[in-house]
Amino acid sequence: MGKCRHNGEVSIFGVRPASFPYFPFNLMDRIGGFVILDELWLRRWCEIIEYPMKIPTLYVPIEDYGIPTVEDMDLIVDFIKYHVSNGREVVVSCIGGHGRTGTVLAIWAGLNGVENPIEYVRECYCECAVETEEQEEFVMEYLKKRL
């Protein structure tokens, strides 16, 4: 299994996972957007954002250990697609960087042709990615509907 790398050092098809409070500020020249999945991160980001930077930010609150709605996942995917297709990367983060972030990463990997996206994300990013059975089922069902 892959070791946990929650500081934005890993890029999976243009998406960089991070966990609170890490943000890859050293890669600002590559970052086009930030997807925040937890209110604590949103509050912290609002404090940090006073730093002179402008990063388009999408806030989609997902309960800890939970899953997004299909509509919210579509919104996240569209946000990522837009920025990646324009040559920029997107940071995705919840708090621990495992379940909710892992779910988004696995779906993104699957949409990019990875055959076993959950295993791929666990190997490339973090062995704890996609924490719950509900999250695993959501990944597979979402990909069935969208591929």
Curated annotation (Swiss-Prot):
Name the record gives this protein: Uncharacterized protein MJECL20
Source organism of the structure: Methanocaldococcus jannaschii (strain ATCC 43067 / DSM 2661 / JAL-1 / JCM 10045 / NBRC 100440)
Family under the similarity heading = To M.jannaschii MJ0215.
Give the molecular function GO annotations.
protein tyrosine phosphatase activity
Record has Phosphoprotein as a keyword: no
Which GO cellular component does the record give, naming just one?
cytoplasm
Q: Which top-level group of life is the source organism from?
A: Archaea
Query: Which keywords does this chain's UniProt record carry?
Result: Plasmid
The protein's matches in Pfam families, at most eight in alphabetical order, are given as: Tc-R-P
Q: InterPro entries annotated for this entry?
A: Prot-tyrosine_phosphatase-like, PTP, Tyr_Pase_dom
